[in-house]
């Protein structure tokens, strides 16, 4: 985080968050891209938020146990390097990957998780959806049903992986797993709660609350991954 000095006092430069709109992508392409971005970051690298929908896939986090994958069928299962256990991604789900230099921002991992959860809660609140987080089970819930999942990885003081918000999707594949390691955990989506009706709508709302919660002063939008 760079500073200017004015009359001997340190002034914080406005922070910029770069938003990458990736459309629908297969999981591994985006996973490898965010690994590469994190590995190649320098002290002056910009923070980014990647917005994407994935083709159907189960991802198994580092804490995952095989017994929580009940019947994957024709949906691929990928072992990944994020925290947490197994979850499902598919069309109609908003996935957002915050690539944040948390060391530079002086953010702890728990603080970042809290900020992400609060961003989701705040975006749902105007729709009169009473969402909340749990201290013992990361994510966001509505009436004990899970609407958003979280799983992060920190490398070189920078975050990657992120959140998945159910918007307007087929929830049936969640029944092929124990979501996040919890047998019988019921999932819910925003469309059924009269919340955001599309991934585009949900993405726009999340970008707004995320930037406000994290304190970014400027947002720059990009289409697709960087060349």
From Swiss-Prot:
Substrate binds at residues 82-89, 149-151, 162-164. Signal peptide: none annotated. The record marks 146 as: Lowers pKa of active site Cys. One of its GO terms (biological process) is protein modification process. The keyword Acyltransferase applies. Residues 43-218 form the BPL/LPL catalytic domain. Keywords: Acyltransferase, Cytoplasm, Transferase. Its main location: cytoplasm. GO terms for molecular function: lipoyl(octanoyl) transferase activity. Its EC number is 2.3.1.181. It is found in: Cytoplasm. One of its GO terms (cellular component) is cytoplasm. SUPFAM superfamilies: Class II aaRS and biotin synthetases. Coiled coil: none annotated. The keyword Lipid metabolism does not apply. Pathway: Protein modification; protein lipoylation via endogenous pathway; protein N(6)-(lipoyl)lysine from octanoyl-[acyl-carrier-protein]: step 1/2. It comes from the Bacteria. It catalyses: octanoyl-[ACP] + L-lysyl-[protein] = N(6)-octanoyl-L-lysyl-[protein] + holo-[ACP] + H(+). Belongs to the LipB family. Catalyzes the transfer of endogenously produced octanoic acid from octanoyl-acyl-carrier-protein onto the lipoyl domains of lipoate-dependent enzymes. Lipoyl-ACP can also act as a substrate although octanoyl-ACP is likely to be the physiological substrate. In the reaction, the free carboxyl group of octanoic acid is attached via an amide linkage to the epsilon-amino group of a specific lysine residue of lipoyl domains of lipoate-dependent enzymes. This is Octanoyltransferase. The lineage of its organism: Bacteria, Pseudomonadati, Pseudomonadota, Gammaproteobacteria, Alteromonadales.
């Amino acid at each position: 985080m760079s500073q200017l000095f004015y009359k001997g006092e340190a002034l914080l430069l406005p922070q910029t968050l770069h938003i990458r709109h990736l459309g629908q992508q297969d999981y591994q392409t985006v996973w490898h891209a965010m690994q590469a971005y994190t590995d190649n970051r320098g002290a002056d690298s910009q923070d980014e938020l990647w917005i994407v929908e994935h083709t159907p896939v189960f991802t198994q986090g580092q804490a995952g146990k095989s017994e929580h994958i009940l019947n994957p069928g024709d949906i691929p299962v990928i072992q990944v390097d994020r925290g947490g256990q197994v979850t499902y991604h598919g069309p109609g789900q908003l996935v957002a990957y915050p690539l944040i230099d948390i060391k530079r921002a002086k953010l702890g991992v728990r603080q970042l998780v809290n900020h992400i959860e609060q961003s989701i809660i705040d975006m749902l609140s105007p729709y009169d959806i009473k969402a909340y987080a749990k201290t013992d089970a990361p994510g966001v819930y509505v009436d004990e049903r899970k609407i958003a999942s979280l799983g992060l990885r920190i490398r070189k003081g920078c975050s990657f992986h992120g959140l998945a918000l159910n918007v307007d999707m087929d929830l049936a594949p969640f029944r092929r797993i124990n979501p996040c390691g919890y047998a019988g955990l019921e999932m819910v989506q925003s469309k059924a709660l009269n919340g955001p009706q599309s991934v585009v709508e949900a993405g726009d709302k999340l970008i707004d609350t995320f930037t406000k919660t994290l304190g970014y002063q400027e947002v720059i939008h990009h289409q697709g991954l960087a060349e």
